[in-house]
Swiss-Prot record:
It comes from Clostridioides difficile (strain 630). One of its GO terms (cellular component) is cytosol. GO terms for biological process: rRNA 5'-end processing. The keyword 4Fe-4S does not apply. Its EC number is 3.1.-.-. Gene3D superfamilies: YqgF/RNase H-like domain (3.30.420.140). Pfam families: RuvX. The keyword Cytoplasm applies. Keywords: Cytoplasm, Hydrolase, Nuclease, Ribosome biogenesis. This is Putative pre-16S rRNA nuclease. One of its GO terms (molecular function) is nuclease activity. SMART domains: YqgFc (SM00732). SUPFAM superfamilies: Ribonuclease H-like.
Length: 141
């Protein structure tokens, strides 16, 4: 059992998908999609979730190019996560998020979720996929 939960993030330019683990560190559940309004406000919203959910570790998806290199979006995510760590004192690990949004979109399409609803939950579901991948890796290693 963990002494807190792990938070999963899918950081984009317009939104941040947020998920948290259960206390055992076995499953990831979606929390919300934050509409980005500015780094300070975004981090304040994350801090509120961290406090409420008793988070002691953060895993952020790291967008890489298909050849494994880091592009401009990956660099933005790293910079934002460095700010999150500085503001919260919580370590941030990165997890390869290639195709997580594609997987999220596919599962929503298979569930026949309307386009309007998909738009609202896609980033939160991507955060769940990122965090669940990380948790599964930790359980099996």
């Amino acid at each position: 059992m963990l002494d807190g939960r792990i938070m999963g993030l899918d950081v984009g330019d317009k939104t941040i998908g947020v998920a948290v683990s259960d206390l055992m560190g076995l499953t990831a559940q979606g929390v919300k999609t934050i509409k980005r309004v500015g780094k300070k406000k975004d981090i304040e919203e994350l801090k509120a979730i961290i406090k409420e959910k008793q988070v002691n570790k953060i895993v952020s998806g790291l967008p890489k190019n298909m050849n494994g290199t880091l592009g401009p979006q990956g660099e933005k995510v790293i910079k934002f996560c460095e700010l999150v760590k500085a503001e919260t004192g919580i370590d941030v690990e990165f997890w390869d998020e290639r195709l997580s949004t594609v997987a999220a979109e596919r599962s929503l399409l298979e569930a026949d979720v309307s386009r309007q609803k998909r738009k609202k939950v896609i980033d939160m579901l991507a955060a769940v996929i990122i965090l669940q991948g990380y948790l599964d890796f930790k359980i099996n290693s």
